[in-house]
Every structure is written in C-alpha cells, then in structure tokens.
Amino acid sequence: MRHYEIVLMIHTDQSDQISNIIEHYTKMIKINKGSIHRLEDWGRRQLAYPIKKLNKAHYILMNIETSTKVLNNIIQDLNLNNFIIRNMIMRVKNAINEPSPMKKTKENKELNN
C-alpha cells in the first residue's frame, strides 16, 4: 500500500454535510483495509481566486495509506461529486502524523485569544 495526501475543497453550501463527506471517504478507505494517518478540518477559507463563482470553500486534509485500486475509486467518486470544488492528491513517501502548518497556526490563534 502507498501513502497519499488529499486536500478537498468543498462548496460552502455543504458545510453542514462535512462530517458525512468525511465519513463517506473514511469508510471507502477502511473497508478496503486502508488507514487514515491524519485527518484535519481546516474550515472555511478564502480562495486566492474565484472558482465556479465562489470566493470561499471548506477545506479538508487527509493523509491515507491505501491501494492504488481504492485510490482510483476515490478519484472517480471525487470527480462525480458536485460538492467537491477542487481536489489535490499527492503521493508521499511516508505516513504523516504530525499536525499540518495550517492546523498549528489555527491552534496558536485560538490559544492567543
């Protein structure tokens, strides 16, 4: 099995469905004996430029370990899902477990307030 990092940009109208979307992809991975090493909900963020006439999106980060077959199923599902504005999937050498820089800055801001 290989390690991948997935970033999803989800339409802001579906912010209340984020947990269902995460659960859907988590099930796809775990049913096929994959594992999730890191899962972060970055929340709503401003886009650098409008995409499909939207200025904000809800961001999700996942670091997973799964087979190529399951990854292809995930890619196909992402492309058919109208709520996913953009996605980025990168292959990484090792599992990443530590918090991302985005998560660290968000936690630091919460501690300072």
UniProtKB/Swiss-Prot annotation:
GO terms for molecular function: small ribosomal subunit rRNA binding; structural constituent of ribosome. Belongs to the bacterial ribosomal protein bS6 family. GO terms for biological process: translation. Keywords: Ribonucleoprotein, Ribosomal protein, RNA-binding, rRNA-binding. SUPFAM superfamilies: Ribosomal protein S6. The keyword ATP-binding does not apply. One of its GO terms (cellular component) is cytosolic small ribosomal subunit. This is Small ribosomal subunit protein bS6. Gene3D superfamilies: 3.30.70.60. Binds together with bS18 to 16S ribosomal RNA. InterPro entries: Ribosomal_bS6, Ribosomal_bS6_CS, Ribosomal_bS6_sf, Ribosomal_S6_plastid/chlpt, Transl_elong_EF1B/ribsomal_bS6.
